[in-house]
UniProtKB/Swiss-Prot annotation:
SUPFAM superfamilies: C-type lectin-like (SSF56436)
Source organism superkingdom: Eukaryota
N-terminal signal peptide: 1-21
Gene designation per UniProt: Reg1
Tissues/organs with expression: Expressed only in regenerating islets, but not in normal pancreatic islets, insulinomas or regenerating liver.
Species this protein is from: Rattus norvegicus (Rat)
Protein name: Lithostathine
Xref: PANTHER family: MANNOSE, PHOSPHOLIPASE, LECTIN RECEPTOR RELATED
Upper taxonomic lineage: Eukaryota, Metazoa, Chordata, Craniata, Vertebrata
Classification via Pfam families: Lectin_C (PF00059)
């Protein structure tokens, strides 16, 4: 008889345990990223498209002054796809949009202004090239804003800022 009591007690505990944990899980608030108005969240960052046209250095400084960010670093294909969608959804007609990749020593060693490692690449066919002495990088509308081209850092382009949420 005692054996049956333990079996019944154990059975009840097994039935109640999963539902107890489930209720507690449902009570927890979900972690949501909040970004300032006009910016969009992706992963743990906020992204802000700026239609104004600035040089690469002016654009990066603008981003640093805005929520301690930088020109956008594109660290994966998924992030590149998000960036392309963000720019297209803005309705811009810009042919090129600055990103945070540059060659500060003009030696074809590319760096993200944020200090992120340069591991992912998405160069457009034939780029980077040496013909235009471009040491700053933009995404191009010809590729749906998914491919990169080097440009003169003095070119006046729209840009995207990236900052921690």
């Amino acid at each position: 008889m005692t054996r049956n009591k333990y079996f019944i007690l154990l059975s009840c505990l097994m039935v109640l345990s999963p539902s107890q944990g489930q209720e507690a899980e449902e009570d927890l608030p979900s972690a949501r990223i909040t970004c300032p108005e006009g910016s969009n969240a992706y992963s743990s960052y906020c992204y802000y498209f700026m239609e104004d046209h600035l040089s690469w250095a002016e654009a990066d400084l603008f981003c640093q002054n805005m929520n301690s960010g930088y020109l956008v670093s594109v660290l994966s294909q998924a992030e590149g796809n998000f960036l392309a969608s963000l720019i297209k959804e803005s309705g811009t007609t810009a042919a090129n949009v600055w990103i945070g990749l540059h060659d500060p020593k003009n030696n074809r060693r590319w760096h993200w202004s944020s200090g992120s490692l340069f591991l992912y690449k998405s160069w457009d066919t034939g780029y980077p090239n040496n013909s235009n002495r471009g040491y700053c990088v933009s995404v191009t509308s010809n590729s749906g804003y998914k491919k990169w081209r080097d440009n003169s850092c003095d070119a006046q382009l729209s840009f995207v800022c990236k900052f921690k949420a």
